[in-house]
Structure formats: C-alpha cells, structure tokens
Amino acid sequence: MASWRQPFSGRSDAAVATSSNDGEFSDGSLKYVGETGGNSNAVTYQEATGAPVEHDSPLGYDVGPFTIVLINVTMMIGTGIYSTPSAILHGTGSVGLMFIYWTLGYLLCIASGAVYLEFTAYFPSRSGSEVVFLEQAFPRPTWFFPTTFAVQSVLLSFGSSNAVVLATYLFRCSTKDPSNWEIKGVALAGYTVACLCLVFNTKYAYWFQNAIGVVKILTLIFIIITGFVVLGGHTDVQDPKANFRNAFEGTGSASAYGLTNALYRIIFSYGGYNNAFNLANEVKNPVQSLKKYAFAALTTVYVLYMFANVAWLSAVPKKELESSGLTAASLFFGNVLGNSGAVRGLNFLIALSAFGNIMAVIVGLSRRLRECGRLVYSESLLRKNKLTYIHRQGVLPWTPFWVSTKPFGTPLGPYFTTWAITALMILAIPSGDAFNFVSDLGVYPGAAFNLAMAVGLYVVRWRRKRANLPTPEFKAWHILVIFNILVQLFVIVMPWYPPEGGMYAGDVSFWYATYVVTGIGILIACALYYYFWAFLLPKWKGYKLRSEAVILDNGVQSHEIRKVPIDELDEWEATHDVAGRLRQTTVLQSEGPEKVSPRSSDSEAKV
C-alpha cells in the first residue's frame, strides 16, 4: 500500500511530538504555548493551533546579512524599474509628481516593514511572514486565515509578469520581432530555468542569486552614471534637462484612475522589500538582522530608483517615455548609444535582472507555501486507540509534498506549484496584457491581507499586554501603522473608480476592473472553502477538528488536523496538550495499544 494511503501506524516518516506541558497558558478561550527556535534566544509565544516552532530549521541557517540585503534587492530590482516608469509618468501626469510617488512608495514600504518587523519580534522562529502573522493575529475562527492565505498563495503563486519582461528584453537583444507565442515560449523557458537553479541546493542557490543581485546593482549604477553623463552634455542627446523644467506641468491632467494605477505600479516596483521576512527562521538573531539589513536594502533601492528615473528623463522626451510601454530602458539605451552592439548587451543585463527577480520571488513564495503546508488537514478518525486512515485533504493536502525537503534539502513541492501555475498564466493570458493584469492582480489581494495584518498588530499588542507577556524587541510607531492602514484602504477602494475614457479605457484591452473582481473572487472562494470544510462537513458528519503536532522527515515539524468523533473528544483532550502534542506516549496500532515509557518534550513517539 502506498505510504500516503496507509494508517499512521504503518508510516515511517511521521511521529507525534510529545510535551511536558511547559510554557502553556490560557487567555480566555485562547490557549498559548511558548517555544524557542534554534535561530533566536527569544521565546515565540503563539496561539496553540498555529504550526509548531521548528527548533532546528531543516533548511539550515544560511541567511546572513549579505543574503538578507541581496535577496530583497534582487527581488525589488527586477522588472519594475525598467517596465513601470511609462505607466507611472502617464498616471501622475508630471515629472515632479512622479518623483513624489516614488518617495511615497518608499515611505509606505518603511511603514509596512515596521509592521512586519514587530510581528517578527513576536514570532522570531517562524518563517512565512504573512501566513504566520495573520494566523496569530486572528486565531478565531480557527484556521481561517491560514486557510484563506494558503489557498490564495497557491492561486497567486505565479511570476508570469516577470517572465514576460524577461522574454521581451531577450528579444530586444536580437533584431527579431517576436510573435505572441514566441514571447510566451521564451518566458516559460526562462521561468523553468530559474526553478531548476533553485531545486538542487539551497546554499548554492543563494550564492547564485546573490551574484545576480550584484550584477543587477552594478547594471543600475551604470545606467545612473550614464544618465549623469547625458545631463553633463557629453552625448548626442539634445537638451537633456528639458524634462526637469516646469517639473509639475501636466499634474492637473492626472485622473483618479491614473493616480491609482500609478500607485499600483509603484507598489509593484518595490515588491520584495519584505522578502527576507519569509526566511526568518533561517536567520540568526532575526529581529536585529532584519531591522538593519532589510532597511538598508530598501533605502539602497530607493536611492537607485530615484537616480534611475533621472537617467530615463535625461535621455527620453516625456511624451516618448509615456508611450514606451515595458521597454523604457531599451528606449534610453537607443537614444544614448544608438543601435550599437552595446545596446543589445545592456538589454541582456536587464533580462538577467528579471531572471534574478524571478528567482527571488520563487524563494519567497516557496517559504510561504511551505509554512501553509505545515498546517494540514488529515482526514483521520481516532477510535478506541485505533487510528483509521481514510485520506488526506484540506488546508493544503498532502503534507510531505509541501513541507518535505527531500531529496536535495529544498522545498520541491512549492517550487513545482509556482512553476505549474506560472506556466498556466503565461499560456492563458495575451502577452500584451499579461504584465499589467498580473501585476495588478497580485497587488489587490495583497492589500487586503496587509490591511488585516496592520489591524491585527493592534490585536496582538492588546492580547499580549493582557496576558502580561514580555515587551517585544521592536515596536512600530503608531504613525507608521496608521499610515499603512490608510494607504491599504486607498489601494482597496480606489481601483473601482473608472478611467476617463470609459469602461474599456484602462491599462488592459478588457474591462478596467477585471483584476479587482478576480481578486475579490479569489478571497470569497477561499472563505467559502473554509466554511465548507471547517463547519458544514463536521456538522453533517458528527466530528470536531483538532490539530496534532507531528514530526516528518529531517525533523520537519507540522500540524495534522484530525477528525475526532464527538463522543471521543474527552479522550482526545485528555491525551493531547493545547499545541496538539501527546501528553503521554501511546503507540497506536491496528490491533490495539502498546504502552511505552513517557518521554520529555523533545522526544518523539512513532505512530
């Protein structure tokens, strides 16, 4: 019988964790446990239904200061700065307001990053960022946010927009005018290669990604220096300072739709400022490390972005830049260097930048999907000390697929998922609309979760104060949290405002708010799915859901959510602590129980 169809008594890769009841306490209806991970001396106090702390990260502790900076920089400096200036300038209407928007994006990232950092101070030994923070901020209804975030993470775990930009700039390296399907084919091939680079070794993948990050920074610095050369009048560009005179001319022509669209492009361009928070359990002393180096990465990118925009505007007339689409950088190189081979080489460097961005996105998504997978629904019945295995389904089905790091020490399941969904998006959406639609679709649900997370920060503060828990190592200023909440509300509400040209005058060839409805539909589908399996099915079939802490291969710790018949709830509660760990070690076999001696909280009982 295949291992995934066997009862747990016949499986060799799962064990039930045991507990000595240390570090447990209650706050009303909520039960909390305190655990320490291998990356920090700070205790992670979390609501007991959350995925357990991994005391020794199976992914290692290879994320140091250099990697923190470069994994964020690599994700931010990808396709945004080369592909969004046209839409941002068009939306804001003027050069001056465009620069204000880039600064607004930087301030928003600081405010949002402060929220991430305070949550990390509360849960320093949990990777996955948003899924952990939402799980702990809103533990009731049980598993609601892990479920909805897990499903939307899977549905939105694609990088097709970056892949399309990669393909576009690769074709710019040649003289060929590609067809729609040629762009799709190269985009899919590029994304596949990026996935393969990450599959075989985590440490070497980080090294390779760091190397690309250095190249990306140097490329942007070269563009900036070239821009200053243009401003100095040392090229054939005529009147390079023309765009900076009357910098706010045209601001009055900006519409509400255009300003909202510009803000979406800004948010997309800074996407990745929080990427290292996904790897918190792989970072030693995560709060101080992320505070220093994530902020350094964000500030570095902000400065580079501002000067890069100066470079674009020094060589490309305003009207020409507004209509350049995704290829502002190619236009810049063409105006400065002509049609020389150097232009093709620089286009390749931008394609390499997009490739590095794809890798960084895959790394962050894989950690979030893995964290979602560590809270998995297992349809199992506990009857008279006999565990009858039926099948597995739920929050994210098939625990080993999501959380296992075999055979290469990398999360193959999440990598495959991101590749499969990206391939579908690349092939399904017209390449001309793919970048705008996908980038907008990713921002809208993200804004909803960021809003919930910022509000949830106040909920966590209130609960911890009431429970008399220690003060966190870092606490965000109120003004930053409030600013973050207001911007997220703006991002959620304003996309409904139509463009001036009518329903089909947006930045895609179809209805302007398609991405809004799609994003809301995804969120509603997640909520309906949760209600079905968490409430309707248990009510119809007469059981309750309870989580059990298990240990999988390589020490990976996860939660199995079991179906326990109502008449056996008392037995379950008597044999498990609030975190789902066995209070005593009882081996469950198909023919009857076998008692073994109790163990400490670090021991395991085979099931």
What are these regions, as identified by a protein language model?
Residues A150-V164, Y270, N274-E282, G341-W398, ...:
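Membrane-helix boundary/coupling elements in multi-pass transport proteins
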Residues P400-L412, N450-I520:
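C-terminal membrane-solvent junction of multi-pass transporters and transport-like membrane proteins
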Residues N21, S29, S57-L59, W102, ...:
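Helix-loop-helix junctions that connect adjacent transmembrane segments
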Residues L59-V63, L70-V73, I81-P178, A297-T300:
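Extracellular loop-to-transmembrane helix junctions
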